Every structure is written in structure tokens, then in C-alpha cells.
């Protein structure tokens, strides 16, 4: 894609938010599958575990990567208002194996959750956060300094895995006045085992 920000009006967002609540939607239960912790902790295979929304644990024998970590109840700057989680994450932070790298795709609250990154930084001493251009300052303002900021097409190699930040069509914002002030994108992973992308 061109990487150009997708423009949509705030009125459309409000309309969608109102209409989705006013519809009489059928509710149903989900069966939650318990992760195979033995396989996760041994890390002898290529394993991807979906934790919830865009949070995935990717393991390839050499490295453990967590994408867009979100473990809290709301995707919002407020802990009492905003979009609420319907299902608990498939894993808790305390259940995670050692995490080498966390990738952040963009600054929206459902992809960059302050409490989640804070708890991860406290739990794992050597964790590295890979973030889009412009977000390092946010992390440092929260006391998290092991952060590497990447522009589109920037790459680095971590434990024999080539990680590249690639453009996608989206946008970024955490408030009313910071639209597209930080970059957004996807992460491409390539190593001797395989290649995949997290959008």
C-alpha cells in the first residue's frame, strides 16, 4: 500500500458507535481454549499464540515476540470509560514466557496500552520495544527506555530474525490533536524457519 493515512470523519465514528449499541444483537458464549503452556515454555517449535485482539505471542526457537500487547479491560485513556473488553485475554502477563521483543504497530489505545507495556517492562528486564517513528518519546515519558524507533522499511536483526517495519494504509492518534504525528505500520519477520507479517 501507499502508506497514506486513511481519512474518516469524527461524525462517522460517533454514528457507528451509537448504531452498534442500539442494534439488538444476539449474544453467545465463546469457548476459550487454554494455551499449551508446555509447548510455549519449552519453545522448541515455531508457535504463534493468539492472546486477544492484535496481541500475539510469536516464538521461533530463537526469539519470543509479543505484538501490540493489550491485557487491560479498556482501550481508552480512562480506566472507567471507553471500549471495554468482552473476553479476557487468552494469557495473563504472569503466564508469559520470557519476552525478548515487543512490537507496536501504531498509537491507538487498543494497540498501545500503557498499563500493559508498563507491566511488561517491569517483568522482563531486557525486553526491547520496537515502535514506529515518533513513539519513542511517549515510552521515555513513561520511564521505559529500552526502545528502538523505526521508520518504514527500517530493519534490524535480533537473534537471527530480520524484523522490518513496513507501511500499511492506516493512521495514528491518541488524542484529538495528535493525528498522524507518529507513524503506523506492520512488522515483517524473516528467519531460517519462515517469513510472516503482523498487520
Where are each of the predicted segments found?
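Divalent metal-coordination and catalytic microenvironments
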Residues: 58, 68, 106, 129, ...
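Metallo-beta-lactamase
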Residues: 1-84, 89-95, 190-199
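Residue-level marker for the onset of beta-strands and adjacent loop->beta junctions
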Residues: 44, 54, 125, 152, ...
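Phosphate- and divalent-cation-binding pockets in alpha/beta enzyme and binding domains
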Residues: 111, 137-141
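Active-site metal-binding motif and surrounding structural segment of the metallo-beta-lactamase
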Residues: 80-131, 146
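Short amphipathic alpha-helix with an adjacent loop that forms part of the alpha/beta core around
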Residues: 90-98, 156-160, 178
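Catalytic core of the metallo-beta-lactamase
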Residues: 54, 59-61, 157-199
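Short, polar loop motifs at secondary-structure junctions
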Residues: 132-138, 151-153
Amino acid at each position: 500500500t501507499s502508506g497514506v493515512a486513511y481519512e474518516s470523519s469524527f461524525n462517522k465514528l460517533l454514528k457507528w458507535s451509537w448504531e452498534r449499541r442500539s442494534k439488538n444483537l444476539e449474544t453467545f458464549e465463546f469457548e476459550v481454549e487454554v494455551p499449551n503452556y508446555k509447548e510455549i515454555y519449552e519453545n522448541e517449535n515455531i508457535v504463534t499464540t493468539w492472546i486477544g485482539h492484535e496481541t500475539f505471542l510469536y516464538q521461533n526457537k530463537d526469539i519470543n515476540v509479543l505484538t501490540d500487547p493489550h491485557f487491560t479491560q479498556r482501550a481508552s485513556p480512562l480506566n472507567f470509560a471507553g471500549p471495554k473488553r468482552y473476553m479476557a485475554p487468552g494469557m495473563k502477563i504472569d503466564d508469559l514466557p520470557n519476552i525478548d521483543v515487543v512490537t507496536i504497530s501504531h498509537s491507538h489505545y487498543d494497540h498501545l496500552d500503557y498499563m500493559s507495556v508498563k507491566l511488561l517492562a517491569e517483568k522482563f528486564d531486557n525486553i526491547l520495544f520496537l515502535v514506529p517513528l515518533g513513539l519513542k518519546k511517549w515510552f521515555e515519558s513513561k520511564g521505559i527506555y529500552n526502545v528502538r524507533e523505526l521508520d518504514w522499511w527500517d530493519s534490524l536483526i535480533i537473534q537471527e530474525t530480520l524484523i522490518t517495519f513496513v507501511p500499511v494504509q492506516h493512521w495514528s492518534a491518541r488524542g484529538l490533536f495528535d493525528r498522524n504525528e507518529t507513524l503506523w505500520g506492520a512488522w515483517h519477520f524473516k528467519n531460517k524457519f519462515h517469513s510472516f507479517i503482523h498487520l
